[in-house]
UniProtKB/Swiss-Prot annotation:
The gene coding this protein: fabH
Protein name: Beta-ketoacyl-[acyl-carrier-protein] synthase III
Gene3D superfamilies (alphabetical): 3.40.47.10
Region (ACP-binding): 248-252
Source organism (scientific name): Acidiphilium cryptum (strain JF-5)
Disulphides: none
Catalytic activity: malonyl-[ACP] + acetyl-CoA + H(+) = 3-oxobutanoyl-[ACP] + CO2 + CoA
Principal location class: cytoplasm
Membership in a protein family: Belongs to the thiolase-like superfamily. FabH family.
Length: 320
């Protein structure tokens, strides 16, 4: 049985850290206000040279190093980002060049905070179909450059960073690999979370706009459905899950999903307190941390899930 195996994980965070206390000197907010509503204590903010390409390439190099693989052994680069360096060429192509990969193909996909789950789903389908044998899936985001820093309802929520995984065709030995992926969208809700502007629309501010209450309401219900779908598709129960690695948007949503699955708090990987919401980068950033510190190990069953603008949402089950 062919199975898409996760061989390496890597991540990159900008050097600069901005705490809630620092934000409180610029806007009408406080550390207590932010923590109570989001669970966020700090976020990493990119310097001028820390672009989506720069951070994504560094995360990719680290994923390759973790897997003991070279760039030219990779067939595809799939980048999930809402904050590309330019309209085109794709950030994926720029990363392909930056890591010294001279073969294969590269492209971006846009699914906002669900982008990494979408990327894993696309890569898994291509590997299973024989279109490629390996793929780097990268989430890289520079949200600090699209925020309205005078809007305390959004600017406190996001941070910058990148994460990457190397996926490769495997045999399914020990049931390892991507077991299933489940992705969805509903464009009727596109107006509750979006960037107001795009290339060629210079009269618009290109700032992130969000109806937080509506996003929260949909997140809880739609993520619950995606999680149930993943378990039912594989005749699994909540007790089979070793780790939940959710999109790191809000501590309340994360805690709600963990409780719904009946997981102990220590089975849920949480980085939102230190990274804030890094959109498509949040899941691979959290995966890398949990792999490096020894929590996620060979044989563990990991559930990832995310919801983002679109609305888009999805889940995936991966046996490490």
């Amino acid at each position: 049985m062919q199975r898409t195996v996760l061989e390496g994980v890597g991540s990159y965070l900008p050097e600069r850290i901005v705490t809630n206390h620092e934000l409180a000197t610029r806007i009408d907010t406080s550390d207590a206000w932010i923590r109570e509503r989001t669970g966020i204590g700090q976020r990493h903010i990119a310097a001028a040279h820390e672009t989506a390409t720069f951070m994504g390439a560094e995360a990719a190099r680290r994923a390759l190093a973790a897997a003991g693989a070279s760039a030219d052994s990779v067939d595809a680069v799939i980048v999930a980002t809402s904050t590309p360096d330019q309209g085109f060429p794709a950030t994926a192509v720029s990363i392909q060049a930056a890591i010294g990969m001279t073969r294969g193909f590269a492209f971006d996909l846009s699914a906002a905070c669900s982008g990494f789950v979408y990327g894993v789903s696309v890569a898994d389908a291509m590997i299973r179909a024989g279109q490629c044998r390996s793929a780097l899936v990268i989430g890289t985001e520079v949200y600090s450059r699209i925020l309205n820093w005078e809007d305390r309802g959004t600017c406190v929520l996001f941070g910058d960073g990148a994460g990457a995984v190397l996926l490769r065709a495997g045999t399914g030995e020990d049931d390892r690999g991507v077991i299933s992926t489940h992705i969805h969208s509903d464009g009727r809700y596109g107006d509750i979370l979006f960037i107001d502007g795009a290339t060629g629309q210079d009269d618009r501010p290109q700032h992130l706009v969000m109806n937080g209450r509506e996003v929260f309401r949909h997140a809880v219900s739609k993520l619950a459905g995606a999680v149930d779908e993943a378990l039912a598709a594989n005749d699994l129960t909540q007790a089979d899950i070793d780790w939940l690695v959710p999109h790191q948007a809000n501590r309340r949503i994360i805690d709600a999903m963990g409780k719904r699955l009946g997981l102990a708090p220590e089975q849920v990987v949480v980085t939102v307190d230190r990274h804030a919401n890094t959109s498509a980068a949040s899941i691979p950033l959290a995966l890398d941390e949990a792999v490096r510190d020894g929590r996620i190990r060979r044989g563990h069953l990991v559930l990832i899930e995310a919801l983002g603008g679109g609305l888009t949402w999805g889940s995936a089950l991966i046996r490490f």
